[in-house]
Amino acid sequence: MLTVLDDYPIHQTPEPLAHVSTSDHNFYDRYWYNAHDRDGLFYFGVGACRYANLGIFDCSLSLAIDGEQHAFHGSRRAPEEAGDLSCGPFRIEILEPMGRHRVTLQENETGISCDLTFVPTSVCV
């Protein structure tokens, strides 16, 4: 199956990008962001993972404030378009490839919501 990303010169095999180049069920692509305050009283972590060979997309946002943890978790069937980085109220947007990323979590039953933009402080290696 061809996807919108197949128009870009980013292939690593002759197959369409929707075809994973390994049959390993543990193969995945993941996003991970985190931050904390200098005193260690506040921490948050955001993760999203696409398990292409399992057909699963998972996401989470975890906050630790004054020693208490609060969390949102989401999971869905992986969308056919790898560029669809949403799961219910959770979404990642690539504002600038290898640069700025935006993470939003709309109002949901956990009471946690956010609109965060991550800006790199070093080059990608």
Roles of regions detected by a PLM:
Residues M1-V125:
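Targeting-peptide/extracellular-domain and disordered-appendage signature
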